[in-house]
């Protein structure tokens, strides 16, 4: 396993056999995301984007109680006490958010415990979300009196629909795992005992597939969500061409012809 060197120990990043691991490592605060951690997220995602050996990335929280419980509110009095400070805070945190949003390889969120506020915003950047039965997901911004940034709101509404998004935002309630599955907020519910194994098996399946095809598929779905049909088709045309010119496609045709 290859360890990626970051300027913080609150974000851990590793690569092993085509799979990247990003761990939120502040369990004493239920992995609340500090500004230092946002910097680490951006650094780690940039490294894993550039690493051709990385086919898929798994995000998880340390400690077994939370994926991430939102922003580290203990910093707010010093770093985010008013609108002016919010903009300064955003200038630093936005790099991590942007890398999560534009990461070209599949992202998997392994949710075990609380996934709240900014933690849910991180999970919404994942392409696939696994959760344990005891997990709780929600956005309690209305209880704290703070504004939730547009990208997170838009991602939530696209995923669960405007009606459910309004319910979650207005009530500030936390969804249990079975409701999160029903509304489409998570893809799979698996036991706490098996989640690491189940997520790893799923990631290995992705890593074994043709990377250009997987990349093009992710780009196509993302374009479908964000653009008009004409803009979406244009955005992925080059990626589709790259698939047809790849060695994976040639080998796939040979394997099919030879019935392998």
Residue ranges with predicted function:
Residues 1-17, 52, 64, 172-178, ...:
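C-terminal alpha-helix plus adjacent terminal tail
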Residues 1-60, 98:
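Conserved CoA-thioester-binding segment of acyl-CoA-metabolizing enzymes
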Residues 22, 26, 40-41, 59, ...:
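Terminal peptide-recognition signature
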Residues 27, 51, 79, 103, ...:
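Generic structural signal for alpha-helix termini and adjacent loop/cap motifs
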Residues 37-40, 89-92, 195, 236:
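Hydrophobic alpha-helical membrane-association signature
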Residues 61-98, 145, 227-228:
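Glycine- (often His-adjacent) and acidic-residue-rich active-site loop
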Residues 98-211, 246, 251, 258:
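Crotonase-fold acyl-CoA enzyme core
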């Amino acid at each position: 396993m290859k360890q990626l060197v970051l300027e913080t120990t609150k974000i851990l990043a590793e690569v092993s056999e085509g799979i990247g691991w990003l761990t939120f490592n502040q369990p004493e605060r239920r992995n609340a995301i500090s500004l230092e951690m946002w910097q680490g997220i951006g650094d780690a995602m940039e490294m894993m984007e550039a690493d051709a050996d990385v086919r898929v990335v798994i995000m998880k929280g340390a400690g077994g109680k939370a994926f991430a419980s939102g922003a580290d509110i203990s910093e707010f009095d010093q770093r985010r006490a008013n609108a002016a400070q919010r903009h300064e805070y955003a200038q630093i945190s936005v790099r991590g958010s942007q890398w999560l949003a534009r990461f070209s390889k599949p992202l998997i969120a392994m949710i075990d415990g609380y996934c709240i506020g900014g933690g849910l915003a991180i999970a919404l950047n994942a392409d696939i979300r696994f959760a344990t039965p005891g997990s709780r997901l929600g956005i309690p911004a209305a209880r704290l009196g703070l504004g939730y940034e547009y990208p997170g709101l838009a991602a939530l509404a696209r995923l669960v629909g405007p009606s459910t998004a309004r319910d979650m935002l207005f009530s500030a309630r936390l969804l249990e795992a079975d409701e999160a599955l029903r509304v489409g907020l998570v893809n799979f519910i698996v036991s706490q005992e098996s989640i690491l194994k189940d997520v790893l098996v799923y990631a290995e399946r992705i890593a074994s597939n043709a990377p250009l095809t997987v990349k093009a598929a992710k780009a196509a779905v993302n374009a479908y969500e964000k653009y008009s049909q004409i803009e979406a088709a244009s955005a992925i045309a080059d990626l589709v061409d790259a698939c047809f010119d790849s060695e994976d496609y040639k080998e796939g045709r040979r394997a099919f012809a030879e019935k392998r």
